[in-house]
Amino acid sequence: MSEYLSVTSLTKYIKYKFDQDPHLQSVLIKGELSNFKKHSSGHLYFNVKDKNSVISAMMFKGNASKIDFEPKEGDEVLLEARVSVYERRGNYQIYVNKMHMDGIGNLYQKLEQLKKKLTKEGFFDQNHKKVIPKFPQKIAVLTAGTGAAIRDIHTTINSRYPLAEQVQINTLVQGEQAKSDIIEKINQADALNVDTIIIGRGGGSIEDLWNFNEEDVVKAIYNCQTPIISAVGHETDFTLSDFVADVRAATPTQAAVMATPDQYELRQYLQQANLSLTRFIKQYMQQKRKHLEHVASYYKFQTPSLLYDQQIQKRDDLEKQLKLSLNLKIKNQQQQLQLLFNNFNLKTFKQRIKRDQLTNNQKRVELSKVMHNLLDNQKNNLARKLENLNNLSPTNTMLRGYTIVNKDDKVITSTKDLAENDNIVLTMKDGVVDAQVKKVRCNDE
């Protein structure tokens, strides 16, 4: 007669088959989150679905804490998980190890999170922006060595302000190596003592422009001492490099316009300034000539002796008064000096010095006693605190028979943080024990 299996036995057998299948231990799944719930324990429970199917899923707290975004109902996600059977209900489900946003949505969310972080840290503050020089002598251009961007920048600068020397620094603007190359070239340009730096490239997708959203690139632009114009992408494209740069240009051509004055406008301005200056000088000379003619007509200038006769007499009177004043001052100083000399008593002065020395010695002894007493009190107080601290240390606590429980490198303080089959580490006074939870019993059960 055939032996009947219990439901539990059959379920355990099916679970065993799932757990032994290597293809089910690490699977990559793409789908939409539904029925998403975050338990008070920190574990996540949800379904993953597409148009035709639904799979139950859960994610333990330790793995959930590593998610780099805030998952919610309806998110399209990429999952790395293992497939197993939940014995209590007898259905299969996935246990998720890693979760990421699917595709471009992840990039936009990452961009927004980084923008908020850098804004909070002050990287985009206006008070950090540097002024672009009006008349640059040397401009560094950081972009790809070939393409429309470098051609437009060179053509525009040569047309507007050929006096400016252009330093072309070929830079990777796309690909895995671009981030480090952009940072290196920014530092290189900053060390060249140029007046302005233009960072530019043509348009592209968010993936193409992503190197200009990297935090390290933003910090390199922020720390650069040379004013920077960012011209990354087209007019509708925005990167974090645009926000941190001193000026943002919609296109590489506009960046070249912002970096230079227009030579034709300068010539027109200089011509106008020359006319205005010439007209001002003529008017000024006419005014001064009229004033000189008016002054020359005064009667004193017609008889020059009237200008200095009275001044000579006034000088003689002042010289006489000065001599009398000096003689009187010298006499008074001599009388005061003689009076001080007569009143000076050398013996009294020595006695006062000796008395002050005795007073100082007494105060020195008293101060030394106070300092020794204070130092002894501080030493005794420190010894008592060290003794109290030693009594409260975890090592002394374990010497009295207590054990510290850790799970996922975190100290467990409540049975509510544990579940059956959890792997835990017990730290005792003489070593460490790796253990597994068989059953959890709470005091309120």
Curated annotation (Swiss-Prot):
The record's annotation in InterPro entries points to: Exonuc_VII_L, Exonuc_VII_lsu_C, OB-fold_nuc-bd_dom
Question: Which domain of life does the protein's organism represent?
Answer: Bacteria
Q: Name one GO molecular function term.
A: exodeoxyribonuclease VII activity
Subcellular location per the Swiss-Prot or TrEMBL entry: Cytoplasm
Gene Ontology CC annotations of this record: cytoplasm; exodeoxyribonuclease VII complex
What keywords appear on the UniProt entry?
A: Cytoplasm, Exonuclease, Hydrolase, Nuclease
Q: What is its main location?
A: cytoplasm
Q: What Enzyme Commission number(s) appear in the record? A: 3.1.11.6
Q: Does the keyword Methyltransferase apply?
A: no
GO annotations under biological process? DNA catabolic process
- Which family does the UniProt entry place this protein in? Belongs to the XseA family.
Give the protein's function.
Bidirectionally degrades single-stranded DNA into large acid-insoluble oligonucleotides, which are then degraded further into small acid-soluble oligonucleotides.
Protein name stated in the entry: Exodeoxyribonuclease 7 large subunit
The species is Staphylococcus saprophyticus subsp. saprophyticus (strain ATCC 15305 / DSM 20229 / NCIMB 8711 / NCTC 7292 / S-41)
Q: Which gene encodes it?
A: xseA
